[in-house]
Amino acid sequence: MLLGSLGVAAIGVLSACGGNDSPSTSASSSSGKNSSAAGAAGSILVWTDSNREPVLRKVAEQFKSDTGVTVKLAVKDFAKIPDDFITQAPTGKGPDAAIAAHDATGRMVQNGVIAPLELGEISAYQDVAIQAFTVNGKIYGVPYATENIALVRNTTFVKDAPKTFDDMIEMGKKSGAKYPFLVGLDPKQSDPYHLYPFQASFGAPVFELKDKGFDSSKVAMGGTNGEKFASWLADQGKTKNFNLNVSQDISKDLFAKGQAAFILTGPWSLDSFTKAGIKYEISEVPSAGDRPATPFVGVQGFWMSAKTKDAVATQKFLVEYIGNPNVQTELFKVGHRPPASKQAFEKAKTDKDVAAFGAVGQKAVPMPNIPAMGSVWADWGVAQAEIISGKASSPKATWDAMVKAIDEKIKKG
């Protein structure tokens, strides 16, 4: 049994401490006793992706046994969940809960389709995971995993981690590798997510930084520091350190073929490197400016619908079962993303790769979760691509125009 000793009594104690385009459904088949804590026996619907479905199916069986409530699972395309949720929740046909990436949370709150959750002892979770699902002081998700990028180096070419971006390029050139450094980009949209650590190292964060994350009402990537980054970005395009024609898939493939000394990527790429027999090490992203290169961290979790007809059972399933360290450990095994639960993370970090990415993630900041981020990413990426490609006659002017456009969109809400 997945949860082993996780009976009703154990659940009470522990609670204190991204598929297919067309949905398919499965329901837990175990029968068991009812629990007044979960309300009258009935059913709830949870949207998940295909990767997490096998784990959730076992958790659903345990929940059915403990409470009498059936958890129906619908497998969905992870990327389509936010839009489908917004469309279906108001009609009463949406789920009671859904797997989610935190950065869409603000939009979901704005549309009134998700409800805040009472997590109990929030100190049981990584601080950054709680911050990620927090909107206007309320927590709107049960986090289960975090992910961030880091620098991966082929130790056949380079033994030691670089301290600065320039050091990295120099080490890569001297290594004998065909490509000193790779980062996957898009010809029209660049990739602000992957390039953000370098931007942050110039003192140009996307928004003003506060103790608990960003103040998303104040765009902070403009001014002198932003212009310095824009000029640096143009230089990287000229020297081909950044190549818009090298996508994420291409960069990963080249590194897996042993043709690159360094690559900027996340844990999602490691399986292909391991299968290819590449010997690698993971380290912090080297700074290009005079400040630390701070990456974004993405957090995955589960939302509860504001339209659920059984908030008690849904909250119980999410907080006490999905939030359980044993369950988060099982979810880690299928995704290899560091668990959001501190207890589960301690167990997972015996894997050196998890420990390395987790160490970088401790210094990362959550991707902003405001509703306007869709427009922010678009404007940001287009400006970067124009600068890197050399199409921007004035990198500084292009950057300043982008910042102004984003600022106006943020103010409009």
What are these regions (language model features)?
Residues 139, 274-334, 393, 411-412:
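Extracytoplasmic/periplasmic substrate-recognition and gating elements
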